[in-house]
């Protein structure tokens, strides 16, 4: 059956990864860029030995936390529009367990990444080994089973020859636009070093062709009829539109037929913010302009969107009595949502073909799009100039903290800097082609409403899983994707404390990243949530046991790692820090102490959250009753 080559399982894995290519729109390039690893006794003598012997073209990076390096790998793949990946290798037990949150993040966002956790012995001879857990009812269960529900594909290798079919399945999944996500291949640590006579044909160059899925004539005609029969259609731009590269087609249809664009977090920066018909973010963290347009719509054209609760305001954002839905998505499952007419096809191709079928059509929005955008831009301008007053300050988040408490924060943190003012100062100061990243807390809402990205694919938000700690780790992935650009992590103190280990990795490998740390000494977003629903401020502020506000010197922490650091508590200090940071070759961190309750509030939106049905607090009871009342106007599925 052809020539054989004797390799260990790990050597075969690395040899195979070097031969995987992807072909999109006539361009062919290697699919696997490199591998992140933290060596332990489960992988150092297998995968470690294989990489040392011959890594091929793979770039190898030593991570500092398994979740962190997997986030970096995911961010790289997401930024590369899912056309390149990094693999991630860990040891057994806790190292593998640390992948669970990162795998869930990749799965929720449909991002391909190859996870290779080591496993316990296939022979079971030394069981239980170090870092192995035991279950009385099954010896077949290991820590790696926890990765099953958060993987798009999962397998366990207990024989070398199993690797071949497993890798083919994994790469089929990772290169499928409709079901891309994390592929997990667990390799027993004794099997990693076990040799086998592999067929040489397994290691030939393999090209994974990503052909654009074509819409059928029935789909095109049905979609065109829906649009032409509508009066006020709105296009909801999702992440699938960005991965498809549908920017030009979206702009052309929007301009030709006067159809407004609104965006999900994943779809933002598919089309530049200053495009006249782009009304910005949609839903709970959306702009007033986008949400007003959506309420007027009689047709929602969803392009590559999952219709999450944040995009649909928990299914209250639209007038479901009159609005119809047209979904264009490579995923059949996503296309079926909200009783839509389904076009299961590539966004770029479909929009290009639809354009010519709409000749003679024009929406009835008239000048409304411009008026809505102007109204919102005026509000954005106001939010850029918020100033704190110690006597009578009216924060964006109202009726939570008294003036006395706000003054206490100003004194404890030595700042009077509002969050929106700081954020928009950054937007105006950093290079236009910079890439920003964020994931959790109040900052994603501020960014979706306020941030203007005028270079496509420069806004990178992980808001499928909203995983705290993705922000700093992911910035390393951005830098690997864009080595010649400035990349910025926009992160709150809560997320920074959760995970920032790959800042050290960035410094170690001279991959300059910039961390913009907003410190309001607490979990401010969740504090807003609890107080908005009748509860008091309970264990979301960072206070000491004698109720003093915690003031951490994060700049000193980062300085200890080797970063260039700055403290900026005024607009002037912030501008100066940003300008100086551009000149640095090493990673930087700018620490900003910002006042609580100065993030943006919601605009004509609602979030369905669980509220206590029974409470001794009247305010909680009222919040529950208000929630039940609002549900009466929400679509139930």
UniProtKB/Swiss-Prot annotation:
GO MF annotation terms: 3D-(3,5/4)-trihydroxycyclohexane-1,2-dione hydrolase activity; acetolactate synthase activity; flavin adenine dinucleotide binding; magnesium ion binding; thiamine pyrophosphate binding
Cofactor(s) in the UniProt record: Mg(2+); thiamine diphosphate
Binding site for thiamine diphosphate: 66
Positions of Mg(2+) binding: 493, 520
Keyword Metal-binding: yes
Region ranges (Thiamine pyrophosphate binding): 442-522
UniProt keyword terms in alphabetical order: Hydrolase, Magnesium, Metal-binding, NAD, Thiamine pyrophosphate
The reaction(s) this protein catalyses: 3D-3,5/4-trihydroxycyclohexane-1,2-dione + H2O = 5-deoxy-D-glucuronate + H(+)
GO CC term, one of those recorded: acetolactate synthase complex
Enzyme Commission number: 3.7.1.22
Record-linked NCBIfam families: myo_inos_iolD (TIGR04377)
Functional note: Involved in the cleavage of the C1-C2 bond of 3D-(3,5/4)-trihydroxycyclohexane-1,2-dione (THcHDO) to yield 5-deoxy-glucuronate (5DG).
Family, as annotated: Belongs to the TPP enzyme family.
Name the record gives this protein: 3D-(3,5/4)-trihydroxycyclohexane-1,2-dione hydrolase
Native organism: Bacillus subtilis (strain 168)
């Amino acid at each position: 059956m052809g020539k054989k080559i004797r390799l260990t399982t790990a050597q075969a894995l690395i040899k195979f990864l070097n031969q995987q290519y992807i072909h999109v729109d006539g361009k062919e390039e290697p699919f696997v860029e490199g591998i992140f690893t933290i060596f332990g006794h489960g992988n150092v003598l297998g995968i470690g030995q294989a990489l040392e012997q011959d890594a091929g073209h793979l770039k190898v990076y030593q991570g500092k936390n398994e979740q962190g390096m997997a986030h970096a790998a995911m961010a790289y793949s997401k930024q590369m529009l899912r056309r390149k990946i990094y693999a991630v290798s860990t040891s057994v037990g806790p190292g593998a367990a640390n992948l669970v949150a990162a795998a869930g993040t990749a799965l929720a966002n449909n991002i391909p990444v190859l996870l290779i956790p080591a496993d316990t012995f296939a022979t079971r001879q030394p069981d239980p080994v170090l870092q192995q857990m035991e279950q009385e009812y099954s010896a077949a269960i290991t820590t790696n089973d926890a990765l099953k529900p958060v993987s798009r594909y999962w397998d366990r290798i207990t024989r070398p020859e199993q690797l071949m079919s497993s890798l083919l399945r994994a790469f089929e999944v990772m290169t499928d636009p409709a079901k891309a996500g994390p592929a997990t291949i667990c390799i027993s640590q004794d099997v990693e070093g076990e040799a086998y006579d592999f067929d040489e044909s397994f290691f030939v160059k393999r090209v994974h062709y990503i052909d654009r899925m074509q819409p059928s004539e029935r789909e095109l005609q049905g979609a065109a009829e829906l649009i032409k029969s509508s009066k006020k259609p709105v296009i909801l731009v999702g992440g699938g539109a960005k991965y498809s590269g549908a920017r030009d087609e979206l702009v052309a249809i929007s301009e030709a037929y006067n159809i407004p664009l609104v965006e999900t977090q994943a779809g933002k920066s598919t089309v530049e913010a200053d495009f006249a018909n782009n009304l910005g973010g949609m839903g709970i963290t959306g702009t007033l302009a986008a949400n007003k347009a959506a309420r007027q719509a009689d047709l929602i054209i969803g392009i590559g969107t999952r219709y999450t609760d944040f995009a649909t305001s928990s299914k209250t954002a639209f007038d479901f009595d009159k609005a119809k839905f047209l979904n264009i998505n490579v995923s059949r499952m996503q296309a079926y949502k909200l009783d839509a007419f389904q076009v299961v096809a590539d966004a770029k191709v479909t929009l290009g073909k639809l354009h010519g079928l709409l000749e003679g059509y024009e929406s009835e929005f008239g000048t409304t799009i411009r008026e809505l955008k102007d109204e919102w831009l005026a509000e954005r301008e106001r939010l850029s100039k918020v100033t704190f007053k110690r006597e009578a300050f009216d924060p964006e988040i109202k009726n939570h903290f008294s003036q006395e408490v706000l003054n206490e924060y100003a004194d404890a943190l030595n700042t009077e800097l509002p969050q929106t003012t700081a954020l928009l100062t950054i937007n105006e100061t950093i290079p236009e082609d910079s890439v920003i990243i964020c994931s959790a807390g109040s900052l994603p809402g501020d960014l979706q409403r306020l941030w203007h990205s005028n270079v496509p694919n420069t806004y990178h938000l992980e808001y499928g899983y909203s995983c705290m700690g993705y922000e700093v780790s992911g910035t390393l992935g951005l830098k690997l994707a864009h080595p010649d650009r400035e990349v910025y992590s926009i992160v709150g103190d809560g997320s920074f404390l959760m995970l920032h280990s790959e800042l050290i990795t960035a410094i170690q490998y001279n991959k300059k990243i910039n961390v913009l740390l907003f410190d309001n000494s607490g979990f401010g977003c969740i504090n807003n949530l609890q107080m908005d629903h009748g509860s008091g401020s309970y264990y979301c502020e960072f206070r000491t046991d004698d109720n003093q506000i915690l003031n951490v010197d994060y700049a000193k922490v980062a300085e200890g790692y080797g970063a260039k650091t700055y403290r900026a508590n005024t607009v002037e200090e912030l501008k100066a820090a940003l300008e100086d940071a551009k000149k640095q070759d090493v990673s930087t961190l700018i620490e900003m102490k910002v006042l609580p309750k100065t993030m943006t509030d919601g605009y004509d939106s609602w979030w369905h959250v669980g509220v206590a049905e029974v409470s001794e607090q009247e305010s909680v009871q009222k919040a529950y009753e208000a929630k039940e009342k609002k549900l009466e106007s929400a679509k139930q599925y």
